[in-house]
Amino acid sequence: VLAGMLLVAGLSFGQVASQDPAVPGVVATQVMMPADKPAEPVVSAVLPTLVPEELKIGTTMENLQAAYNGESNAYKRYLAFAVKAEEEKYLQVARLFRAAAKSEEIHVADRAKLIEKLGSKAVADIKKPEVKSTKENLEASVKGELWESEKMYPAFAKKAKEENAETALEIFKNSAIVENDHAKFFQDALANLGTMKEAKTEYLVCNVCGKTTKDMEIKSCPVCQSPREIFEVIK
C-alpha cells in the first residue's frame, strides 16, 4: 500500500544503504558527503497518511521503486495502527491492520526481488507513521488504498505494458486488486466500528501476492492462483 505523497528526488550526495530495524528487509537511505557523481534518484514518502495531489509516472523501474517505498511505509504504518487499535480496545480492527501489514510486507519483498533482478537496489525512505484515533486511521487507510488501487497501480501497469515489462505488469495489476480489497475491509470496519471490539474473525493472507480474505474455505488464490496451503492465517 502507498497512502503517502510520492516525491521523486535526485540526490546530489552519496547514498549509503542501511537496514531499517522497524521494517524487515527494507533498506533505508542516509546522506553523506558529496560523491564523485550524483546518486540515482530515490523515491521518498512524505506524510504517509496523505494522498498525493499528483501521480508521478516514471519508467517501470522508477515505478517499482515508488511502489517499494510506499509499501515499506505502509507495512510500518499498519503495524502502528494495529497497536493503536489495541490500545483503544478495537481488537478486530487491530487484527485487520496486522493482516494488511502482512500483505504489504509480502509486496515489499516482491518488489525488492524484481528490482534486484533487474540490476538495481531497492531503497526506501521510512517515515514515522502519523497515528491518530482508530477511526481516523481507518479513514486515512481507505483513502490511501483507493488511490493505489484506482489510480497508482493502474497507471503503473499501463506504463509496464508500454515497456513490455511483463513481470512488473503482473505485479501492478495484482496489487490493484489486493489494495482494493484492503479498502473494502477498512470501509466495512469504519461502518461497523462499534462491533469491532472483540476479535472474532481471522484473516488469510496469500504469501505470494498478498491477497487478503476472510474466506476460510478458499481453495486457491483468486488473484495469483496459488494453492490454499500458501495462505497464512492472521489471528
Regions found by a protein language model. Give the residues of each.
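Sec-dependent N-terminal signal peptides
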Residues: 1-15
